[in-house]
Amino acid sequence: MTADRPVTLAAIAGAHGVRGEVRLKLFGEGAETLRAFSVFDAGDRKLTLKSVRPANQGAVAAFVEIADRSAAEALRGTLLTVPRSALPPLGPGEYYHHDLIGLPCVSTEGAPVGHVAAVDNFGAGDILEIEKPDGKRFMVPMTVTAVPTWDAETVTVNAAFIE
């Protein structure tokens, strides 16, 4: 994982009102996590956060550079990113979903399995979606039993969980 790799925290879903506020689709913990960042990369420009509040299915935000509804609408679909190095440090046993995506997976017996294609959470904990070399996917719960170890280079999956 590289410190400069961009991490997408939200996407602009459209305008909210007439004063340049935007609706955001969030990819993280919630609107409050965006407050930790003052500037976001938005394609070929930077946006400075003025305010953000929770809203139905996401958040509503105001940025210094967006003055009216037309400017807000023009940014629909824009991804808001920060460098990986700007994220808070992790404690033992913690991980960011984007750090796992793309990592190769091996079984506890050492055999290659595939790679992490996605990390989902449907409310009961994180689930790794692993894609095999043949393109077929299977899911594994992100628990010590199913995934005994992982690091920045590889994810080890208990052989009993491999389909």
Curated annotation (Swiss-Prot):
Family according to the record: Belongs to the RimM family.
Subunit structure: Binds ribosomal protein uS19.
Recorded GO MF terms: ribosome binding
Segments forming domain PRC barrel: 92-161
Location(s), subcellular: Cytoplasm
Comment on protein domains: The PRC barrel domain binds ribosomal protein uS19.
One Gene Ontology biological process: ribosomal small subunit biogenesis
Entry protein name: Ribosome maturation factor RimM
UniProt key word DNA-binding: no
GO cellular-component term (any): cytoplasm
Physiological role: An accessory protein needed during the final step in the assembly of 30S ribosomal subunit, possibly for assembly of the head region. Essential for efficient processing of 16S rRNA. May be needed both before and after RbfA during the maturation of 16S rRNA. It has affinity for free ribosomal 30S subunits but not for 70S ribosomes.
Keywords carried by this UniProt record: Chaperone, Cytoplasm, Ribosome biogenesis, rRNA processing
Membrane-crossing residue ranges in chain numbering: none
A Pfam cross-reference name: PRC_RimM
